[in-house]
Design a protein with these regions (language model features):
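Gly/Pro-rich turn-and-neighbor structural signature
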Residues: 140-191, 195, 374, 404, ...
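NTP-handling and nucleic-acid-processing catalytic cores
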Residues: 1-45, 116-150, 154, 176, ...
Length: 595
């Protein structure tokens, strides 16, 4: 028969296409719509059967050539044209796969899918993070069709069906009578894995309700139709409950250019090679904290290396704490008599705990990573450890231990091996393993606003002083006059800046520069005659380099072809760099004019 169907592409070829409902998935659907007979013309070994008439017994490849020859003989062949077509090949044998109509086992999907759609309208639904991925679940449940669960594979759970002649038996146990033969097929792997949330907990007998429903499933968006959907409807059917409360979706790992990793491109990365060079914790921290939920991640070895440096920073900070606590005992631990810097770090710690817990609850691991990185590197290692060196009493040692312990606990989900190792060496700990210790809790009593502002002020002043000293290029050849009224603050600043041997008389006649910040002031006294010419020469060189670079960038950005054809992010980066260089040029010119 000649039939009309929207499957035919009117823009391709003649707009007319032959169909074989028994040998093509799309043709099968067309045949169903028009009640066409499904005529199988192949044997299971891919030779032609009696329905192929004169081609009966021929191999499929030979038969195709014979069909073309016959068309030529009958003057029915108009032309032969090569086209690009999707043809399935076996991954193992590299042989073309022929769709073949056969009897299989199916799951009737419509009742199961409707149950999912109903549950997702209630408060007892599966919450997707990000929420937009729920649409994939709903879409597949709306358009669902019966699911073929038979697979012709060696490995897998056997289909629980037995045959004896025309009789069929399905059950958990094999028939006791002789003569029954079990189905040779196995269950689709997604059918078996969809039972995971409850089958591992004792189902169908004595299921452990402490762990079901599971709290969260973490998976990629590419297998929502294959796995997530099926876990949801299997769980609803067998347990009358959802399999997990939250479903956290992550993206794919791509190469540095944003391409999907594949064998053909040769851009895949063996994680074992990365672990061998940088350690498992470096790779784990990079993968878990460098992208937002649902977003793809570009693999960047430099970022893994950066994480490795971060781990070394934490390791060295831990060594400092442990070395200073060699004789520290449990009875020495005290948080009494805290000074301002102790209160500062405890305030920063509790602010970090609050932000980390909030972000962990929302699965914003990228925010958690940035928050912990900033606190550990900037606040704990670079600032507090330096501040603590000038006051090594039991209170400061106790604060160091408390902060380090809470850092290890917060970092443990992202760096399990290093944190467990350091935790095992702590002189005082609540449990043998960090895995069974309590997670840090925000303590509003350890928020010291006034003391935090004071230390923030001092640290900003120290930064300003160092910047001014570098700008003057005075090295160690300078003296200072202090106008800091608070002697405790002055002592802290002088210790941090190593100024104790540089105090001089206010009346000394020499060039001076004032460093002032929020009520703190120190005058730097120096002899600039030695460095003036050298500094002027360096500034002139910097000015020339900036002018050359600005000229090059302006020429590039004035090229219409470049602006239109180059990636937008590259063009934008060029514009940003141009503006930065123009700003720096103004600074250099001002310095030269003031000399």
């Amino acid at each position: 028969p000649v039939i009309g169907d929207f499957h035919a592409d009117m823009e391709f070829g003649t707009g007319v296409v032959k169909i074989t409902p028994a040998h093509d998935p799309n043709d099968f659907e067309v045949g169903n719509r028009h009640n066409l007979e499904r005529i199988c013309v192949m044997n299971p070994d891919a030779t032609m059967n009696e329905n192929a008439l004169e081609f009966n017994g021929l191999d499929r490849y030979v038969a195709r050539e014979k069909v073309v020859e016959r068309l030529k003989e009958d003057n029915l062949l108009i032309k032969i044209k090569e086209i690009t077509h999707n043809v399935g090949f076996s991954e193992r044998t590299d042989v073309m796969v022929e769709p073949y109509l056969s009897k299989q086992w199916f799951v009737k999907m419509r009742p199961l899918a409707d149950r999912v759609l109903e549950v997702q309208k209630t408060n007892n639904k599966v919450n997707f993070v990000p929420k937009r991925f729920e649409k994939i679940l709903l879409h597949w449940m709306e358009i669902t069709y019966d699911w073929c669960i038979s697979r012709q594979l060696w490995w897998g759970h056997r289909i629980p069906a037995w045959y004896k002649g025309d009789e069929v038996y399905v059950g958990m146990e094999a028939p006791k009578e002789e003569g029954w033969v079990q189905d040779v097929d196995v269950l689709d792997t997604w059918f078996s894995s969809a039972l995971w949330p409850f089958s591992t907990l004792g189902w169908p007998d004595n299921m452990d309700s402490r762990y079901f429903p599971n709290d969260v499933l973490v998976t990629g968006y590419d297998i929502i139709p294959f796995w997530v959907c099926r876990m949801v409807f299997q769980s609803l059917h067998f347990t009358d409950n959802i399999p997990f409360k939250d479903c956290l979706i992550h993206g794919l790992i791509r190469d540095k250019q944003g391409r999907k990793m594949s064998k053909s491109l040769g851009n895949g990365v063996d994680p074992m090679d990365v672990i061998e060079e940088y350690g498992a914790d470096s790779l784990r921290f990079f993968l878990t904290t460098n992208t937002a939920p649902g977003m793809d991640l570009r693999y960047d070895e430099e970022k893994v290396k950066s994480t490795w440096n971060f781990i070394n920073k934490l390791w060295n900070a831990s060594r400092f704490v442990l070395i200073n606590m060699e004789d520290f005992k449990k009875e020495d631990y005290t948080l009494d008599n805290l000074n301002d810097q102790d209160k500062w770090i405890l305030t920063k710690l509790n602010q970090t705990i609050k932000e980390v817990r909030k972000s962990m609850d929302k699965y914003d691991f990228n925010i958690v990573g940035n928050t912990l990185y900033s606190f550990i590197w900037n606040d704990f290692c670079d600032k507090y450890i330096e501040l603590s060196k000038f006051n090594q009493n039991n209170t400061t040692k106790s604060v160091l231990l408390k902060v380090l312990t809470d850092i290890l606990k917060m970092m443990h989900p992202f760096m399990p091996f290093v944190t467990e190792e350091i935790y095992s060496m702590l002189p005082i700990k609540e449990s043998e393993s960090i895995m069974i210790s309590s997670y840090p809790v925000y303590n509003k009593k350890e928020i010291y606003k006034e003391e935090k502002e004071n230390i923030d002020n001092i640290l900003e002043f120290i930064t300003s002083f160092r910047n001014k000293k570098a700008e003057l290029n005075v090295g160690s050849d300078f003296q200072v006059i202090s106008y800091i009224q608070n002697k405790e603050n002055e002592s802290l600043i002088f210790n941090m800046l190593k100024l104790n041997d540089k105090i001089c008389d206010e009346n000394k006649e020499i060039n001076s520069e004032i460093v002032e910040y929020n009520g703190l002031r120190i005058d730097i006294l120096y002899d600039n005659s030695k460095n003036l010419e050298e500094e002027k020469e360096n500034l002139q060189k910097e000015k020339e380099n900036l002018l050359n670079s600005i000229s090059r960038r302006e020429k590039l950005l004035s090229n219409v072809n470049y602006v239109n054809k180059a990636p937008a992010n590259i063009v934008e980066a060029e514009r940003n760099n141009l503006q930065k260089e123009k700003d720096q040029l103004k600074i250099v010119e001002n310095k030269l004019s003031n000399m």
